[in-house]
Amino acid sequence: MKNYRTESDSFGEIQIEEKFYWGAQTQRSLENFKIGKQKMPEILIRALAILKKCAAQVNHEFGDLEAKIAISIDKATDRILEGEFEDNFPLVVWQTGSGTQTNMNMNEVIASIANEELTGKKGGKSPVHPNDHVNKGQSSNDSFPTAMHIATVLATKQQLIPALNNILTSLQDKSKDWDKIIKIGRTHLQDATPLTLKQEFSGYITQIEYALERIENALQKVYLLAQGGTAVGTGINSKIGFDIKFAEKVAEFTKQPFKTAPNKFESLAAHDALVEFSGTLNTIAVSLMKIANDIRLLGSGPRCGLGELHLPENEPGSSIMPGKVNPTQVEALTMVCSQVMGNHVTVTIAGSNGHLELNVFKPVIIYNILQSIELLSDSVNSFVTHCVKGLEPNIARINDLRDKSLMLVTALNPHIGYDNAAKIAKEAHKHGITLKEAAKKLNLLSEAKFDKIVVPEKMVSQS
């Protein structure tokens, strides 16, 4: 049999199962928003706990929160950050667009934990009040966007940047000895002039290097925190200097360069910084989609495709075709990239709906950004472990395709002109003969002269 306790808010009393620490506003949200199963991300909950910890410390230093209350709030946030109360944050993303219910969920749980420590009884509003003490000098309108920024930075630094460094290092290590492997290039999916396999992979490496640079650039505005703007950006009920001191506390605790936002009206009414950051995630997805698809194409086969790369064989690929093995890691990564691109569309629409003094699409913005970070990080690490590290060049196939290519004729352009070189290529293709045979047949070039000019090793750099 379940035990219940009575909590209350401005709408009256409500029953809450005794084992949970939340209060009336959280319970009402649970009952009013039975929509989907997409709960607020765990890292956002952690960001809110960090926020409440730092706010309590500043309020105490400013003389607005007595030591006993401040210490109890500080201890409660520590326990939350240690993962002790994970089942006490049950609210879904689909709630008020300001994130008020989740902000109050945190306020109520912290107050309840603190009250239990001080009185032996969870819940209630005394001696620690969820609004008057835990939420002191704050509004959901500045607290939730602050938590959004903290969560984005932490997720990026803890998950995404390490994952991108992982694939960067793996691509560098894998391709470092491929500078002597000369293969045929392809443009428009048609044969082109040669390059080395290392040169081809250097393009992918640079894309990842640029991705890391883009992240650092986009994070600069995400480091700016809205806290101190309170309801509409004026800072009502927040003391002068609270915003600066708060940002310093968060920076110290997280070891990240957070600062107070110079204009709180912008920080509450718009989320351009997060839209920009989502755009960076979208660009990373574009880069990864290109890299993964190239590896998919280069590994196509095993007998009837390009077959220039051997991809690791991790599991059976077909329920009907015996022996078939598919590029499953590529498929997983490219599906993630598709999801991230879709997430950015959602963030773009949500970011554009900042009406007057407050954007009220905050939960869906942060949900999609954090999902994109998590999916990109996990899929990249999986791709590295189960695909990139096991890539091997198929030297025989690479050499065969290169030597058959008609585009080696490009080396003849400076010597016999574009039109004559084109005649050789067309003649070779039409009659199924080699370029050398076609050149001799058309009396355009001797075999000796051809062999001196058409050297793939000399075609992979400027003359």
From Swiss-Prot:
According to the UniProt entry, where is the signal peptide?
Answer: none
Which residues are noted in the entry as substrate-binding?
98-100, 129-132, 139-141, 187, 319, 324-326
Gene Ontology BP, a term: fumarate metabolic process
**Entry's family note:** Belongs to the class-II fumarase/aspartase family. Fumarase subfamily.
Note from the entry: There are 2 substrate-binding sites: the catalytic A site, and the non-catalytic B site that may play a role in the transfer of substrate or product between the active site and the solvent. Alternatively, the B site may bind allosteric effectors.
Q: What is said about its interaction partners and assembly?
A: Homotetramer.
Name of the protein: Fumarate hydratase class II
Which organism encodes this protein?
Rickettsia conorii (strain ATCC VR-613 / Malish 7)
Its lineage opens with: Bacteria, Pseudomonadati, Pseudomonadota, Alphaproteobacteria, Rickettsiales
Whichever gene encodes this chain, its name is fumC
